[in-house]
Amino acid sequence: MINERINELRQLMKKRQIDAYVVPTSDPHQSEYLADFYKTREYITGFTGSAGLAVITKNEAGLWTDGRYFIQAENELKNSEVKLFRMGNKGVPTYYEFINNVVQEYGKIGLDGNCFSYHEYKNLLDNIGNKVIISDIDYIGDIWEKRPKEPNSKAFVLDIKYAGETVSSKLNKIRKEMSSQGIDYTFIGSPEDICYLFNIRGNDIEYNPVLISYTLISKNKAILYISSEKIDKTVKSYLSKNKIELKEYEEIYEDIRNIPAKSKVYLDPQRTNVKIYNSFQDRKSTRLNSSH
């Protein structure tokens, strides 16, 4: 079954002349744990561990994971062509080195930039020489039949006696720091940080009380980008009272495009996906500050 999926993927790669396709363990927010919808690496390799990365080429398929999962990976990969690369062991190439060994100069590397952190993308770019990265390819989504639905849990308000600090107090601290550094906008892509900031919770990821969402904070606005299906009247009223504007999840891209020229934006490249980061970069004159 896994080999059949890999062959389907290779057919799509061939059509677009992609030499290697990289599949991380990630979602658009670089969460440590994933909703079932985003378990693309598990789908293409059969490995169910919570950490790892896969690379599929024309003739090879590899999985990189750490020592916690060596035995599990051996068992789960044994009926497929996927080769286990034991990270940290002597003589085992990194996935960058593997790509350099099997893909020629100016070859094409494909990945889904929606589920790839800019931090890791930059590391990949810095380690593969003159190869070309195409970051708008969701091949796993194209071949995944009966894919689980996207997470859609209902938001709820965390009582202030548990939260310990009001939303306005937290926003004031952020805006004070923004002002001291001359920052016009702060982008937050981490669901746990967003839920902490706004004192809300959800169940979009099993055992993690978070909501898949983005936030953009300016001097005068705080916008929560989230599926409206997750927000009932009570939560909507609560957010409104706290001067938090609600917009649909996908509207983040349009708002990034509308950021005034020469604005200074703060973000975390480890928790910002390539698609979002590039949307900011496309503004040309927008200056990005990061935590790394």
What does each of the following model-derived ranges do?
Residues 1-104, 116, 120-259:
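N-terminal accessory/capping or targeting/presequence segment of soluble
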Residues 115-117, 271-272:
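Acidic, metal-coordinating catalytic cores used for nucleic-acid/nucleotide bond scission
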Residues 268-282:
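Extended, highly charged accessory segments
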Residues 286-291:
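Conserved small/polar residues in nucleotide/adenosyl-binding loops
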